[in-house]
């Protein structure tokens, strides 16, 4: 859904306003939070200590909405024609992959992370000078939602601050 909102914004003759995009991002973040809580618990793991904490579902949903909304917008803000956003997303996803392998939390989702990273490598190949392929909002927003999903599936949502620190600083 998020990819389509970015695509339609890119394709529009008159770009959508920041408020409309923000509201659409918020709506998508709410859908992600509800979907995540439907299929997963509201349990998080503090990676450093290995402590597991159960957060009330309503609080977890609010924090998930914030995480997804921030991830979408931070990744979108770092998007440019030079492949910066794609490169930073690969670094972020590989950090999630390594940490998830160390913590042994969700091995099955790691294959999705690797697949997404390989797809981004293909994009970066064609984005190199002279650029033949541009990502636009469609790609950067999809990357943001995937990063948030990967961190959520790791059951360590606060780890986003560490693994996406460069994206946050740039965005």
Locate predicted features.
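"…together with the soluble PPM/PP2C metallo-phosphatase catalytic core" -> "…together
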Residues: 1-169
């Amino acid at each position: 859904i998020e990819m389509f909102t970015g695509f339609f914004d890119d394709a529009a003759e008159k770009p959508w306003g920041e408020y409309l995009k923000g509201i659409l991002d918020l709506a998508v973040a709410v859908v992600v939070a509800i979907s995540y809580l439907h299929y997963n618990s509201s349990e998080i793991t503090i990676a450093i200590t290995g402590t597991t904490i159960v957060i009330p579902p309503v609080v977890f949903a609010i924090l998930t909405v914030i995480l997804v909304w921030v991830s979408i917008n931070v990744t979108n803000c770092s998007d440019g024609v030079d492949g910066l956003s794609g490169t930073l997303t690969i670094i972020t996803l590989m950090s999630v992959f390594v940490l998830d392998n160390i913590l042994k939390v969700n091995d099955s989702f790691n294959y999705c992370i690797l697949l997404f990273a390989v797809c981004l490598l293909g994009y970066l190949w064609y984005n190199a000078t002279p650029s033949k392929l541009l990502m636009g909002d469609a790609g950067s927003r999809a990357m943001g939602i995937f990063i948030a999903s990967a961190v959520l599936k790791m059951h360590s949502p606060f780890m986003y601050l560490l693994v996406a620190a460069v994206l946050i600083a740039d965005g």
